[in-house]
Amino acid sequence: EQSGQRNMVAGLGAYRLSRSEGDWNLSDISDQITYVRKQGGKGCAFFRAGFVIGNEKGLYNELKNRFFKYPAQLPPLTWMSATHAAPCEPQEVHVTRERGGLRLRWEGSPDCLYTLYYAQADSIDLASARSILATGIRTNEWFLPINADAEREYTFCVTASNRYRIESRPSRSTYYYFSRYDK
């Protein structure tokens, strides 16, 4: 309530998992993450990073496999932007097949960061984190390695974000059917 419309993140003491610092159970941190999410928190910061990276009591694995399974965008900094205006949406994604995968290209401003969404279906649920293939892309292209033996359909679209992380509308969706046979 008192955040002034700024993003507040909870600081969680990953160091408390250490025997010398409290010997907490992994469930203590997991319960705190769940609580923060239920309260509408914008994220968590873990102190100290070495305990996360060092996988103390399996914390890194728990975060990667349970809580932060999919890429996520950083929240917008709307209070810093005078206009709150989103950048123009990028142009349609163009897909070309290359050895080992697909090359995705689009047109957009060089001042933006891009988020690439995809689905292995004919439509994309932009509200689902599962649909984010990559975020924070600094160029207008991406290479997606794929299994050349599997026939599969893909749908792609891209959004642009300005320096305040305000996201544009999505580009038009591009449908691509990958086949091991040339068509």
Model-identified regions with their sequence ranges:
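Extracellular low-complexity, O-glycosylation-prone stalks/linkers
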Residues: 111-131
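Beta-strand-rich modules
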Residues: 145-168
